[in-house]
């Protein structure tokens, strides 16, 4: 039976939500009611599949961890007042912590003046952020296109590469096995997981996938393309595969890919949506090898965990294809004043507090601890790996990985799996995580594995 629109119901629902937004705390009855509402509305109006996905953060089927507020720079608080150490970081958006006061203040100050731009007059913060990124990024990267997400930044990169290379008769892209570049149609064509790709086949033509980290396979793809006249327009890579399971390539791999691109006249697109903004111990992961891409994709942490923003930064030679018609690729909300204010403040915090260096030091501490645990529990843990504050613990199978996430939740530490590798649990905390909290995370991981070991022995 068709449901008629109800203005009265919509008004009541929005008013109820606004009342909740105004509240700082909830009493016990309000908390229980909110939990029930959120679960019901997710089931009936968002997507019931998300409830199954979040089964590791529920007890007794009540999905008690309904997110309510940030506890501190490094923690989250649910509606029951339980505080969790955040080792997920919103999949890498909270590099400067939760509600970083510098970022929040910048956004609030801009909100008091002009939240969104007119679209016709020149907006100053977009210009200032573009200038800042030109100074911050490696090599000849100079011009920025701003959008709202990592997927959008990849879409822009692919379109830029097409616009630049099509007149040169080059139409083919090389991506890698295990890659994740987003789920819009263009980005999905570069993404490598069949689960995400198959329902939307056929995707964009002209994408080849080669094994990640295998420079011989990459070289062969270039050579074969040259022989057949199907020449390569661009290579798109993550310096470290995030959703693939935090997979690090062999040292020198990016350097060799850069050489191949130069030899065959292809563009190098680096997707640093997850590895960028200090996450791996450098501002950008490509700096570990001093590699300079032609196009760089950023998002996630660029907005400081306060505003969504993505950026596609390119050299003048590549970006100039948009000079004659700047409306070839645009987006209404991309580069809006609030998002740019957040990004500028985020960059300021990263540099002022030298957070990339902190990520390297704290990451070493955590990774050493996880590797020790892997040695102690070889029947549960297959590997521990990472760079900076982008780490992963790979378990012997998917179910063991899920049990670890569930046990860590009981220890009040938030972790989750990677999208392309279910048995791998990512450890991706804010770069502001204190040494004391690092030690607490390792203690919790030890407790979780010990509990899992007892269960195994009882069986």
Curated annotation (Swiss-Prot):
It catalyses: an alkane-alpha,omega-diamine + 2-oxoglutarate = an omega-aminoaldehyde + L-glutamate; putrescine + 2-oxoglutarate = 1-pyrroline + L-glutamate + H2O; cadaverine + 2-oxoglutarate = 5-aminopentanal + L-glutamate. The modification N6-(pyridoxal phosphate)lysine is found at residue 300. It is an enzyme of class 2 (transferase). Its EC number is 2.6.1.82, 2.6.1.29. GO terms for biological process: L-lysine catabolic process; putrescine catabolic process. Its cofactor is pyridoxal 5'-phosphate. PANTHER family: AMINOTRANSFERASE CLASS III, PUTRESCINE AMINOTRANSFERASE. The gene is patA. Pathway: Amine and polyamine degradation; putrescine degradation; 4-aminobutanal from putrescine (transaminase route): step 1/1. InterPro entries: Aminotrans_3, Aminotrans_3_PPA_site, Class-III_PLP-dep_AT, Putrescine_aminotransferase, PyrdxlP-dep_Trfase, PyrdxlP-dep_Trfase_major, PyrdxlP-dep_Trfase_small. Signal peptide: none annotated. GO terms for molecular function: diamine transaminase activity; identical protein binding; putrescine--2-oxoglutarate transaminase activity; pyridoxal phosphate binding. Catalyzes the aminotransferase reaction from putrescine to 2-oxoglutarate, leading to glutamate and 4-aminobutanal, which spontaneously cyclizes to form 1-pyrroline. This is the first step in one of two pathways for putrescine degradation, where putrescine is converted into 4-aminobutanoate (gamma-aminobutyrate or GABA) via 4-aminobutanal. Also functions as a cadaverine transaminase in a a L-lysine degradation pathway to succinate that proceeds via cadaverine, glutarate and L-2-hydroxyglutarate. This is Putrescine aminotransferase. It comes from the Bacteria. Belongs to the class-III pyridoxal-phosphate-dependent aminotransferase family. Putrescine aminotransferase subfamily. The keyword Zinc-finger does not apply.
């Amino acid at each position: 039976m068709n449901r008629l629109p109800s203005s009265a119901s919509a008004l009541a629902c929005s008013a109820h939500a606004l009342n909740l937004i105004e509240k700082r705390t909830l009493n016990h009855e309000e908390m229980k009611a909110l939990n029930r509402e959120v679960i019901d509305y997710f089931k009936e109006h968002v997507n019931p599949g998300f409830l199954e996905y979040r089964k590791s953060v529920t007890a007794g089927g009540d999905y008690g961890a309904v997110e309510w507020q940030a506890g501190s720079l490094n923690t989250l608080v649910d509606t029951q007042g339980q505080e969790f150490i955040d080792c997920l970081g919103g999949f890498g958006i909270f590099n400067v912590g939760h509600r970083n006061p510098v970022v929040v203040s910048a956004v609030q100050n801009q909100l008091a003046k002009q939240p969104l731009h007119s679209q016709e007059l020149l907006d100053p913060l977009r210009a200032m952020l573009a200038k800042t990124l030109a100074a911050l990024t490696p090599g000849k990267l100079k011009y920025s296109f701003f959008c709202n997400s990592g997927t959008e930044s990849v879409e822009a990169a692919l379109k830029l590469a097409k616009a630049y290379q099509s007149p040169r008769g080059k139409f083919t892209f090389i991506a890698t096995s295990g890659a994740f570049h987003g789920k819009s149609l263009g980005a999905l064509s570069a993404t490598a997981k069949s689960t995400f790709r198959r329902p939307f086949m056929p995707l964009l033509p002209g994408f080849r996938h080669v094994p990640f980290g295998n420079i011989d396979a990459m070289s062969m793809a270039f050579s074969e393309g040259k022989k057949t006249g199907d020449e390569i327009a661009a290579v798109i890579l993550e310096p470290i595969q995030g959703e693939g399971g935090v997979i690090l390539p062999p040292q020198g791999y990016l350097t060799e890919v850069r050489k191949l691109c130069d030899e065959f006249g292809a563009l190098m697109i680096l997707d640093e949506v997850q590895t960028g903004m200090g996450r791996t111990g450098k501002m950008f992961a490509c700096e570990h090898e001093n590699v300079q891409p032609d196009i760089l994709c950023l998002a996630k942490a660029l907005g400081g965990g306060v505003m969504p923003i993505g950026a596609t930064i390119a050299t003048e030679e590549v970006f100039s294809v948009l000079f004659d018609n700047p409306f070839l690729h645009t987006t209404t909300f991309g580069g809006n004043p609030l998002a740019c204010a957040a990004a500028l403040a985020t960059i300021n915090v990263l540099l002022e507090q030298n957070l990339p260096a902190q990520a390297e030091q704290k990451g070493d501490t955590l990774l050493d601890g996880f590797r020790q645990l892997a040695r102690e529990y070889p029947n549960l843990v297959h590997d521990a790996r990472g760079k900076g504050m982008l780490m992963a613990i790979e378990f012997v199978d998917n179910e063991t990985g899920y049990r670890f996430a569930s046990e860590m939740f009981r220890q009040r530490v938030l972790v989750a799996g990677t999208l392309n590798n279910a048995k791998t649990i990512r450890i991706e905390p804010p770069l502001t995580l204190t040494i004391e909290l690092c030690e607490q995370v390792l203690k919790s991981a030890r407790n979780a594995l010990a509990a899992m070991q007892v269960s195994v022995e009882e069986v």
